[in-house]
């Protein structure tokens, strides 16, 4: 019979735990790196890459930065638009839901299809809502600029555009329709 010390038992138990923690840190850093590179490059394609492809892409990008031969970086100085950030987050969440459902034993295929089609419909509705909101805002801005340019300035006005601005009405969902929020 082989004698094992408390230290050996502790190491046997602790080693897998430490390995899981190390992998969790690596995955967290990879996700952070992925979003940072996507922000700097202005390319959302990297968000859909697997870990190895993303690391290779990050290495190529860093080499380009080091040598000064940076290929076109369209949005390097400007932060991503809130809508783009939301889209990326939503798609990452949908991918995570899909992954979890696929790895859950006993998960009904019909339930998975139902959830994924629901998420797709919601995403499509959100895009349509945003497009309608953008259109109404641009029409209101055009109408406002026409009204402001044609209105005579009074002696009390400063002559700035903000003097004639009125608050633009924000589109509200219908009474029966609830506005979806990701939180």
From Swiss-Prot:
Query: Biological process GO annotation list?
Result: cell differentiation; nervous system development; regulation of DNA-templated transcription
Cellular localisation: Nucleus
Which N-terminal residues, if any, form the signal peptide? none
Orange domain sequence ranges: 86-119
The record's principal subcellular location, in a coarse class, is nucleus
Q: Does the keyword Phosphoprotein apply?
A: no
List the InterPro entries hit by this protein, alphabetically: bHLH_dom, HES_HEY, HLH_DNA-bd_sf, Orange_dom
Where do the segments described as Disordered lie?
A: 152-183
A molecular function (GO) held by this record is: protein dimerization activity
| WRPW motif, short sequence motif: residues | 180-183
Q: Which UniProt keywords apply?
A: Developmental protein, Differentiation, DNA-binding, Neurogenesis, Nucleus, Repressor, Transcription, Transcription regulation
Fetch the Pfam families from UniProt: Hairy_orange, HLH
The UniProt entry, under SMART domains, shows: HLH, ORANGE
Annotated PROSITE patterns: BHLH, ORANGE
Q: Identify the GO cellular component terms for this protein.
A: nucleus
Q: bHLH domain spans which residues?
A: 10-65
Describe, as the record does, how this protein assembles with itself and its partners. Answer: Transcription repression requires formation of a complex with a corepressor protein (Groucho). Forms homodimers.
Summary of the function given for this chain in its UniProt record: Participates in the control of cell fate choice by uncommitted neuroectodermal cells in the embryo. Transcriptional repressor. Binds DNA on N-box motifs: 5'-CACNAG-3'.
Know anything about its domains from the record?
The orange domain and the basic helix-loop-helix motif mediate repression of specific transcriptional activators, such as basic helix-loop-helix protein dimers. The C-terminal WRPW motif is a transcriptional repression domain necessary for the interaction with Groucho, a transcriptional corepressor recruited to specific target DNA by Hairy-related proteins.
| Name of the featured protein | Enhancer of split m8 protein
Recorded source organism is Drosophila hydei
Gene from which the chain derives = E(spl)m8-HLH
């Amino acid at each position: 019979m082989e004698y094992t010390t408390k230290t050996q038992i502790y190491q046997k138990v602790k080693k897998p735990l430490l390995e899981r923690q190390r992998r969790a840190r690596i995955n967290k850093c990879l996700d952070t790196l992925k979003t940072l590179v996507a922000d700097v490059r202005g390319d959302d394609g990297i968000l859909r890459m697997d870990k190895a492809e993303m690391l290779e892409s990050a290495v190529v990008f860093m080499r380009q930065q080091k040598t000064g031969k940076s290929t076109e970086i369209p949005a390097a100085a400007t932060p991503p638009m809130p809508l783009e950030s939301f889209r990326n987050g939503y798609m990452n969440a949908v991918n995570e839901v899909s992954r979890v459902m696929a790895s859950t034993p006993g998960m009904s295929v019909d339930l998975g299809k139902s959830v994924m089609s629901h998420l797709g419909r919601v995403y499509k509705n959100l895009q349509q809502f945003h497009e309608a909101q953008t259109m109404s805002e641009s029409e209101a801005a055009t109408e406002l600029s026409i009204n402001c340019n044609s209105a005579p300035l009074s002696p009390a006005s400063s002559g700035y555009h903000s003097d004639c601005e009125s608050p633009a009405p924000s589109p509200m969902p219908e009474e029966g329709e609830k506005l979806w929020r990701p939180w």
